[in-house]
Amino acid sequence: MKRFVLMVGLVLSLAFLLTLPSGALAPQAKVPASLKAGVTQRLGADTDITIAYSRPGVKGRKIWGDLVPFGLAPGNKYSKDKPFPWRAGANENTTIEFNKDLLIEGNKLPAGKYGIHMIPSEKDWTIIFSKNNSAWGSFAYNQEEDALRIIVTPIKAPQQEWLMYGFEDLAGTSATAYLHWEQLKVPFKIKLAQ
């Protein structure tokens, strides 16, 4: 009788395990500290602009001039001791992609996918659109791969815990793209190239 009860218990336990979803017993993937995000805006009839990035949090830290230094970041072992710009997000390269030529702050940028890097300062910021869109961060940044550099002025903004990109001032064939993090917004104007 004990053997019978033991066998029934074993069969029921096995049946229960077989009914669990396949991932229930597998180790769970670790959630990254900076989640991936993206935003897309259409201009005109058929021009899509997509910014893909990862979203670090403020988490009580001083961001500008500290976590994100003003000027180029000092070199480290990943950059082979070469100073580098900020990756304009976290983890992988922040990218912008569009299917038609655009004017960025009045400067023509051909259709394509570009890595975005930034050089912050206390006054004006340099935004770099790099032909290298697949680097991990900015450690391997090479100025010779720049497609365009623009200078913009950041503005004070309400507190934003998680870094985000967005579009505002939509006018059919133009918009202002922006990075917003902590209490700062970094806008840059985009317009269809006619």
Spans of features found by a protein language model:
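Positively charged n-region of N-terminal signal peptides that target proteins for export
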Residues: M1-F4
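Conserved short hydrophobic patches within well-ordered secondary structure
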Residues: L6-G9, Y114
